[in-house]
């Protein structure tokens, strides 16, 4: 399958500070791909280089197809109406308006409101609609559900999955690890300007090692314990609580979340 995006030996520096140190990765056509990294890791710079919003020093970037970019914030005029913005973007892209897409995102339901009157969720939907004008092949989403309530998040997740089912390639930047784990086929983690990991969430788990988290609720409070030997640790904890005559109200065990594995990789620095 032809890659939607290829990044080869990408380097970018600001003065003497090397932000991207020759990173390589590919994004397959039709996948949802997340680019992650703590502040200062180079994630935003990498995305802006791929989107064509920032110049890079050396390397090569290939994007196969048209791009659509949904930014986290927008500089739309406060008093512009959603359909006015849609018509402007359609004119700039020299394309027809896709009424079915607008209906799916609920844009016509808010067409009489001014931008300043829209809720966070409505603005997110409008930003996505503007990114989809011109029927792009590759769509960049920057924190698409930030500030949304649960219903709004689930609705937008459904829209993203629908785009994938249409063969679109989605590049997602998010600080919400649960969202990434739910939506994405693969993830890349940037650390100090290098790609520390690129693969699936389960491959990340294998990379950092299987960790278990024991959550114990007692009358004194809740505590979580991390271990790679669940049986011995659980027996030891229960014996200790029994000796202290502490009554256990509830015990839960899980294998850890993507966020916990992400933190572990950052702690290791690799």
Regions found by a protein language model. Give the residues of each.
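Helix-to-loop junction immediately C-terminal to a conserved catalytic motif
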Residues: 51
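Conserved ABC ATPase "signature" region
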Residues: 87, 96-111
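Catalytic Walker B motif of ABC-type/P-loop ATPase nucleotide-binding domains
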Residues: 139-143
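ABC ATPase "signature
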Residues: 198-199
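Short, charged/small-residue-rich alpha-helical element at the C-terminal edge
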Residues: 203-270
């Amino acid at each position: 399958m032809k890659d939607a995006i290829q990044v080869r030996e990408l380097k970018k520096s600001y003065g003497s500070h090397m932000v991207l140190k020759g990173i390589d990765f590919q994004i397959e056509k039709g996948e949802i791909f997340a680019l992650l990294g703590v502040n200062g890791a180079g994630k935003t710079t990498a995305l802006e280089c791929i989107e064509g919003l920032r110049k890079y020093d050396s390397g090569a970037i290939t994007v196969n197809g048209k791009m659509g970019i949904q930014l986290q914030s927008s500089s739309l005029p406060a008093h512009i109406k959603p359909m006015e913005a849609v018509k402007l973007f359609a004119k700039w892209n020299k394309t027809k308006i896709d009424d079915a897409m607008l209906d799916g995102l609920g844009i016509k339901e808010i067409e009489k409101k001014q931008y300043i009157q829209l809720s966070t969720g409505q603005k997110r939907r409008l930003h996505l609609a503007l990114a989809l004008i011109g029927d792009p092949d590759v769509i960049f989403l920057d924190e698409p559900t930030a500030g949304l309530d649960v219903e709004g998040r689930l609705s937008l997740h459904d829209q993203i999955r629908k785009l994938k089912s249409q063969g679109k390639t989605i590049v997602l930047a998010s600080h919400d690890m649960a969202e990434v784990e739910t939506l994405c086929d693969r993830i890349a983690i940037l650390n100090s300007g290098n790609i520390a990991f690129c693969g699936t969430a389960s491959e990340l788990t294998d990379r950092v090692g299987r960790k278990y988290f024991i959550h114990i609720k007692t009358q004194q409070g809740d505590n979580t314990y991390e271990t790679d030997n669940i049986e011995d640790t659980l027996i030891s904890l229960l014996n200790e609580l029994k000796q202290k005559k502490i009554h256990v109200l509830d015990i839960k065990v899980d294998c850890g979340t993507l966020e916990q594995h992400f933190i572990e990789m950052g702690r290791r620095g690799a």
